[in-house]
Swiss-Prot record:
It is an enzyme of class 3 (hydrolase). It is found in: Mitochondrion inner membrane. Its EC number is 3.6.5.-. It comes from Candida dubliniensis (strain CD36 / ATCC MYA-646 / CBS 7987 / NCPF 3949 / NRRL Y-17841) (Yeast). The lineage of its organism: Eukaryota, Fungi, Dikarya, Ascomycota, Saccharomycotina. Belongs to the TRAFAC class translation factor GTPase superfamily. Classic translation factor GTPase family. LepA subfamily. Promotes mitochondrial protein synthesis. May act as a fidelity factor of the translation reaction, by catalyzing a one-codon backward translocation of tRNAs on improperly translocated ribosomes. Binds to mitochondrial ribosomes in a GTP-dependent manner. The gene is GUF1. This is Translation factor GUF1, mitochondrial. It catalyses: GTP + H2O = GDP + phosphate + H(+). Residues 57-237 form the tr-type G domain. GO terms for biological process: positive regulation of translation; translation.
Length: 654
């Protein structure tokens, strides 16, 4: 039982308990009064006592499966309000910590929040794990699902089932999660609840009678969700009496306390001062702080089996925080097996990154390193370009991941950065049996090395698209033009079609989603997953200016696209070059063979303007001398290309 708090003590953070629980506990204080009256120590002690009294059978860990913009963050806010974690009307999108998450309406980093709920009879401890929905962040999604017993399958009543919903459903289903269908945005005039229920039944084989129709915006029927979670989602399978095993779900870098890790305690307890051991790096750490997210970091003296909580391990190098790693208590780890699911993230998209101003490299290098600390899935190594100077070769999980990283760099550090055209990891198989993965187009075998190669392999993805019936022809044409191969077509209800195509990853990263949105007037949705490597006729194309290859503009393409792409490149690059005193040739070359060419005519000075009209021999002599001089300049002259030309070309400023 809580002691009546002394007046005058001010609690500086967080809501304590829901009004429902306060009433059930016969306390007369509201949440706001508790904030004022309970000191920080009393608050923490009361919080720990309440957690300790809740049996693991009353824990529920769940996530929300949804397509982008189907209302996941808004629904999370309503659930937090309902359980007293935040005040009604407080800031929206509580779980979206990054600016880019709020602005784009996407979740990039996995987050969690703890909630207390009392049904009038007993207490429950709920952990809502907010996961990214986009395939680029699928590693974080699968790790988050591993800490959950179930999920809310959120579907927009006006849009129905979308591609991301389908992909994340199958991921959650494959991991054994219990799914509760939620139909959101029923307050819209365009809402079609019956159609959404039919789609849920036909696409996911879920009982439409289990659907809960809500409006996260207005709060209509949201109160039905948590009782359904308690009834349908199982409690975590764990044992507080066993030795400690904790799964690392996510991590981030805090400038004041260092690395903060989000962990799922599978067995045992963890407390401040405990020495823990990493299963994969074999390094030990002294735990500086443990606690729950309520909704922000709220320290407690312990966290126990079943909880999804945070720890501050005193880790000096954030690169040691391997998502999916298992942590044990030092000295009690013998014969313990690591938890399944650890896998190093594999970048699928690579870009060259260079500061817009070369003088800023050193300052930007520090900023780049700091940002990478928060995202272990980004690979980073320095590289040098003849055209753009010092820079970095960055590896990302996908094109959205690359775009988000660039935006975070600009918003959080004010840095201006140039990204080269995205490329994918190609596999080269040599005649001697050696295999090599190439991530930089400049390293792709050229004409001299071509004869040592047995075959070239390029990665493919299985793209899942949902489109309205009237645009199916446009989408099929788009996929065909991008070397796609149809695998499946399924007609959903309410005029929607589900298409599955296998498409080269290189085509996907070249704004395929933008083109898909364009040919469907914005109504299509897309998700994808890796589909392995295939043998392919791919070639290295170099853009040469007066015979000099421009390494920053080298690309790898399919031979069938060589002529069209070469023509596009030389025509566009010509716009950004200034006139010279001699003729300049811009060529696209494949294995030293020119596939496209543009010419910039030489500046011409009128050397005959002072001659008399009748002096024909002198006139011809001067023209001949000028012609010979330009020929010599072309042979020995060097074209100076301003950095702005590369920037404009790579940014596609047409």
């Amino acid at each position: 039982m809580l002691l009546r708090p002394k007046s005058g003590n001010i609690l500086k953070y967080g809501h304590f308990l829901s009004k429902r629980w306060l009433t059930a506990s016969k306390l007369l204080y509201s949440v706001e009064e508790m904030k004022i009256k309970i000191s920080q120590d009393q608050y923490r002690k009361a919080l720990e006592e309440r957690i300790d009294k809740i049996p693991i059978e009353n824990y529920r860990n769940f996530s929300i499966v949804a397509h982008v913009d189907h209302g996941k963050s808004t629904l999370s806010d309503r659930l937090l309000e309902m359980t007293g974690v935040i005040k009604p009307g407080s800031k929206s999108q509580v779980l979206d910590k990054l600016d880019v998450e709020r602005e784009r309406g996407i979740t990039v980093k996995a987050q969690t929040v703890s909630m207390f709920y009392n049904d009038g009879k007993q207490d429950y401890l709920l952990h809502l794990v907010d996961t990214p929905g986009h395939v680029d962040f699928r590693a974080e999604v699968s790790r988050s699902y591993a800490s959950c017993g179930g999920a809310l399958l959120l579907v927009d009543a006006s849009q129905g089932v979308q591609a991301q919903t389908v992909a994340n459903f199958y991921l959650a289903y494959s991991m054994g999660l219990k799914l509760i269908p939620i139909i959101n945005k029923i307050d819209l005039d365009s809402a079609n609840i019956a159609g959404a229920k039919e789609q849920i039944e036909t696409t996911f084989e879920l009982d439409p009678n289990d659907c809960i129709a809500v409006s996260a915006k207005t709060g209509l029927n949201v109160e039905q969700i948590i009782p359904s979670v308690i009834k349908n989602i199982p409690s975590p399978v764990c044992d507080v009496n066993k030795p400690l095993r904790a799964l690392l779900v996510d991590s981030w870098h805090d400038p004041y306390v260092g690395v903060v890790m989000l962990v799922h305690i599978v067995d045992g307890k963890m407390k401040k001062g405990m020495k823990i051991l990493s299963a994969h790096t074999n390094r030990t750490y002294d735990v500086k702080e443990v606690g729950i997210m309520y909704p922000d970091r709220t320290p407690t003296s312990f966290i126990k089996a079943g909880q999804v909580a945070y720890i501050i391990p005193g880790m000096k190098n954030p690169r040691e925080a391997l998502v999916g790693d298992t942590f044990y208590q030092m000295g009690k780890h013998e014969d313990l097996e690591p938890l399944p699911g650890f896998e190093e993230p594999k970048p699928m998209v690579f870009v060259g990154a260079f500061p817009a101003d070369g003088k800023e490299f050193n300052a930007m290098d520090d900023q780049m390193q700091n940002l990478v600390l928060n995202d272990r899935s980004v690979t980073l190594e320095q590289e040098t370009s003849n055209a753009l100077g010092l820079g970095w070769r960055l590896g990302f999980l996908g094109s959205l991941h690359a775009s988000v990283f660039k935006e975070r760099l600009e918003k959080e550090y004010g840095a201006k950065i140039i990204l080269t055209a995205p490329t994918v990891p190609y596999k080269i198989i040599y005649k001697n049996g050696e295999e090599k993965i190439v991530t930089n187009p400049d390293d792709f075998p050229d004409n001299q090395k071509h004869y040592d190669v047995e075959s070239y392999m390029e990665p493919y993805v299985e793209a899942i698209m949902t489109v309205p019936n009237e645009y199916i022809g446009n989408v099929m044409t788009l996929c065909l033009n991008n070397r796609g191969e149809q695998k499946e077509i399924e007609y959903l209800t309410t005029g929607q079609v589900l298409l599955k195509y296998e498409i080269p990853t290189s085509q996907l990263v070249e704004d395929f989603f933008g083109k898909l949105k364009g040919c469907t007037k914005g109504y299509a949705s897309l998700d994808y997953e890796e589909a392995g490597y295939r043998k392919s006729d791919i070639v290295k194309m170099q853009l040469c200016v007066n015979g000099e290859p421009q390494d920053a503009l080298t690309t790898v393409i399919h031979r069938s696209q060589a002529q069209a792409r070469g023509k596009e490149y030389v025509t566009r690059f010509k716009k950004y070059l200034s006139y010279q005193l001699f003729e300049v040739a811009i060529q696209a070359k494949i294995n030293n063979k020119v596939v496209a060419r543009e010419t910039i005519k030489a500046k011409r000075k009128d050397v005959t303007q002072r001659l008399h009209a009748a002096d024909i021999s002198r006139y011809k002599k001067l023209l001949e001398r000028q012609k010979e001089g330009k020929k010599q300049m072309k042979l020995s002259g060097k074209v100076t290309i301003k950095n702005d030309a590369y920037q404009a070309f790579l940014r596609r400023e047409d």
